[in-house]
Amino acid sequence: MSKALIPVITTRGLAAVFNAQNTGLSAEITHIALGDHGRTPSKNEVGLVNERMRIAIADGERIDDYQIHLTGLADGDTEFWVREIGFILKDGTMLAVWSDTDPLAYKSAEVPLLLAFDLVLAALPANSVNIIGTGANLSLAAWGEQLAAVAAANVDNMARHVELLFRVNDLEKG
């Protein structure tokens, strides 16, 4: 599912970015917060209204001076509709918040939720935000060899079942 998310840069997030720049550093996004309270977000927010889960960013990259791509994996027993997302800096400040009364996704206890975001940060100075991830590559391309092996095993299993079906049919005829 692909939905355009337009997060609101928070006042405290903007201040954190400028403070980092004044010391010669870049602000660092390290976590994604997920919650279930839908609303119209405000620049004055300091946290999600009802945060249900906070996940470390798995991987990320800079697309250009104002755009970053980041991924995360929401796993665990918690179940809820994702209606609010916060992008959290290393110091705990919420840089940006997105929310809507229509849910973005459902976080199931049974299936991990893979999240991927492209954030355009045109309201911030160029290259002022970096991504700090765990190094886990969640790209499907990284899992290509394993997926191909599973697919080959499935096809082999189906071929055995078809062969068995033909044998049963022959026995029933005779």
Regions found by a protein language model. Name each.
Residues S139-E172:
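Heptad-repeat coiled-coil amphipathic alpha-helices that mediate oligomerization/assembly
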